[in-house]
A protein has these predicted regions:
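N-terminal helix-cap/turn-to-beta initiation motif at the start of protein domains
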Residues: 20-35
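Sec-dependent N-terminal signal peptides
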Residues: 4-13
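Short, solvent-exposed loop/hinge segments that bridge or flank secondary-structure elements
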Residues: 35-70, 76, 145
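Residue-level recognition of beta-strand termini and adjacent short loop/turns
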Residues: 47-48, 105, 128
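Sec/Tat signal peptide C-region and signal peptidase I cleavage site
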Residues: 15-19
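Short beta-strand segments that buttress and anchor functional surface loops
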Residues: 34-36, 54-64, 86-90, 109-115, ...
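Contiguous, well-ordered beta-strand patches that form the walls/edges
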Residues: 68-116
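Edge beta-strand at a domain terminus
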Residues: 20, 101, 126, 131-157
Length: 157
């Protein structure tokens, strides 16, 4: 019985890891320059020997200030220990915040950190191949004042 339970657990973990890496082609859609009304996100796939599976994505989030564009945060999405994590580092921050992927589909990626003050969730939703919606909120059941949504369109630089 113990062998059967161990085997079932092994298969379950293996299938979860496969399911996570199997979603990589959908995450690759994130690559590129996404422009919104008040800023943009620029995502680049990075090959890094320090990253498990060699999969990571680097982002610089820019906010528009009048006619100037200033970076305000660096983000990385990495595949590590059989799951995806989103690591956010605001420019003025002393340390990074890690969000774990809790849902990943062809069109939606949800990263959560219930212990973080705000946001507790970061959601990337592909509305089409050329349109991306980013939402940050205070977790499930957030009120309207605790939800921020940005829409971006893919543009070539």
């Amino acid at each position: 019985m113990k062998k059967l339970l161990f085997f079932a657990l092994f298969i379950s973990v293996g299938m979860n890891a496969f399911a996570q890496t199997d979603l990589l082609p959908h995450l690759l859609k994130l690559q590129g320059n996404w422009v919104g009304l008040t800023g943009r996100e620029e995502w680049t796939k990075v090959e890094d020997e320090m990253v498990i599976e060699g999969i990571s994505f680097y982002n610089v989030n820019y906010e528009e200030y009048g006619t100037n564009e200033l970076p305000n945060e660096h983000s990385v999405i990495v595949y590590d220990n059989d799951h995806w994590v989103y690591i956010a580092t605001p420019l003025e921050a002393d340390k990074s915040t890690i969000f774990t992927c809790t849902k990943a589909t062809a069109t939606e990626w949800i990263f959560e950190n219930p212990t973080h003050d705000f946001p507790k969730r970061i959601i990337y939703r592909f509305l089409s191949d050329e349109q991306l919606e980013t939402t940050i909120d205070a977790g499930l059941g957030s009120g309207p004042k605790d939800v921020k949504v940005w829409k971006y369109w893919k543009k070539k630089i």
